[in-house]
Amino acid sequence: VPKVLLVSRFSWILIRRRSHSADTFVHLIGVTHPSPAKAAQFRAVDLVSIKVAAKAARDAGVRHFVYLSVAQPAPVMKAFLEVRRHGEELVRATGLSATFVRPCYVLGLGHRWPYPLLPFYWLAERLPWTRESARRLGLVTIRQMIRTLVWSIENPPNGVRILGVPEIRATTLSLPQNDRL
């Protein structure tokens, strides 16, 4: 069973000290409810945290880094996309094996407004001229994300692995039933 480190601090020293016994570092830190109006927060929170985390994980000898990124390319949220892309570059530069998980939007508690759009996504995934974009920018559930993160931790890659929306949807792993997810 891999040893996993979950932290929510910006302290490189704290992260480095706690990372020594971990096999996998999972980075989930980011601004809540992203919107184009939060560009400065993306740089102050998301970018700073990934800089600290990537360096600390490398220095601590962690073997696998899991980074929650975002679907790329995407037509909106340019600052968010830019920060996440830069975060991926920082993780790649460490030389660690890495998994970049790239959802577009995660449906779950408090994030249900896009459900009425599901029929439009279904149609767009079937039309040849919109299929690729609709699949890359599709909606995933919190349950699919949890399955993907757990699977990523339990199956570290040799090198870099990118899991986009199609891969997130296809991840199979049994999870206990929980109606809240």
Predicted regions, residues:
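Short amphipathic alpha-helical segments at helix-loop
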Residues: 34-38, 71-72, 130-133
